[in-house]
Amino acid sequence: MANVADTKLYDILGVPPGASENELKKAYRKLAKEYHPDKNPNAGDKFKEISFAYEVLSNPEKRELYDRYGEQGLREGSGGGGGMDDIFSHIFGGGLFGFMGNQSRSRNGRRRGEDMMHPLKVSLEDLYNGKTTKLQLSKNVLCSACSGQGGKSGAVQKCSACRGRGVRIMIRQLAPGMVQQMQSVCSDCNGEGEVINEKDRCKKCEGKKVIKEVKILEVHVDKGMKHGQRITFTGEADQAPGVEPGDIVLLLQEKEHEVFQRDGNDLHMTYKIGLVEALCGFQFTFKHLDGRQIVVKYPPGKVIEPGCVRVVRGEGMPQYRNPFEKGDLYIKFDVQFPENNWINPDKLSELEDLLPSRPEVPNIIGETEEVELQEFDSTRGSGGGQRREAYNDSSDEESSSHHGPGVQCAHQ
């Protein structure tokens, strides 16, 4: 006998774990004929078990998962599917697909309703300071007039079209001895499995068993919460007879801020300064997310390079559930250089005397050729990738024949 983790599906088909593909097919055909709903109307569940077992064991990938890991292998390797929860629960004593979707079974065995997911847009200020807000939602609740029965006592009858199952099973023959089972929601009862005569229906809910109700939730957005974090209201989703209500889940969506960008518990911002500030020190003020006016000072003599980053410790976002601890604030400096010809040429020599001296120009031996640096617009590209140099003696006619500007430095 092959060494497998579980044999329940093999036992359903009555074959050993090492059964070949032909043996599986032969066993399935025999059992499918015996328990076909047309031949044996009371064996619908048994037919589902047989079909499920054959579907798994006839698929090499699913069979390998099942052989190696048993139920757990199918649990983790399956993508889930509607209507399969009852089959797997009957075979293995537990749901396979319930945990994969929004609908499952609760601990007390009752079917669990779907969760209701709602986006909640919040500002960065809300996430920094915390916020309490009210959210109005519309949901289904059990009708109080009929206690969720849909009509007076005894008026509810089992749907004869689907025999109370809520679904209709259709069998399609693929080949002699091989059939495919398909199921769809019963149109007579809309999947309820029950019908109520129109004269006996509840006047308040019109036989629907539930009515719409407006629910107002008080939502607490705690300090330090993040984009994508969830706030859950357990059991507050739609109600339905015989079903445990699911949860209302609010998904936080952080709105873009005009000054700050968030990275975990840290904040980032960009600040523009002039050349004189970069060289001679500066002071500036900005408004933080809690309304405080923060003064930033940088001493004269300490140079700020273009694009450099400095940090202010402890001025980032508060930590979730530990709001007295905060991340850091990172400030990137955009140094704005003066425009061309901003100073009188006579003053340039005075400025040069104040700045660090130039590096010495090395002596060049041999012939040289002088070229001119021109302005370059990086958004226009480099002229189709052609390697060209802008020479000082280029004529207007020659320039117009080129496909774009020459290689130049970006103007600041």
Curated annotation (Swiss-Prot):
It comes from the Eukaryota. One of its GO terms (biological process) is response to heat. The modification Cysteine methyl ester is found at residue 409. SMART domains: DnaJ. The modification Phosphoserine is found at residues 78, 123, 394-395. It holds the Pfam family DnaJ. Its main location: membrane. It is a lipid-anchor. CXXCXGXG motif repeats lie at residues 143-150, 159-166, 186-193, 202-209. SUPFAM superfamilies: Chaperone J-domain, DnaJ/Hsp40 cysteine-rich domain, HSP40/DnaJ peptide-binding domain. The modification Phosphotyrosine is found at residue 391. Residues 410-412 form a propeptide. A zinc finger (CR-type) spans 130-214. Zn(2+) 1 binds at residues 143, 146, 202, 205. The modification N6-acetyllysine is found at residues 39, 152. GO terms for molecular function: ATP binding; ATPase activator activity; Hsp70 protein binding; protein-folding chaperone binding; unfolded protein binding; zinc ion binding. GO terms for cellular component: cytoplasm; cytosol; extracellular exosome; membrane. Residues 365-412 are annotated as: Disordered. The keyword Lipoprotein applies. HAMAP family: DnaJ. This is DnaJ homolog subfamily A member 2. It comes from Homo sapiens (Human). The gene is DNAJA2.
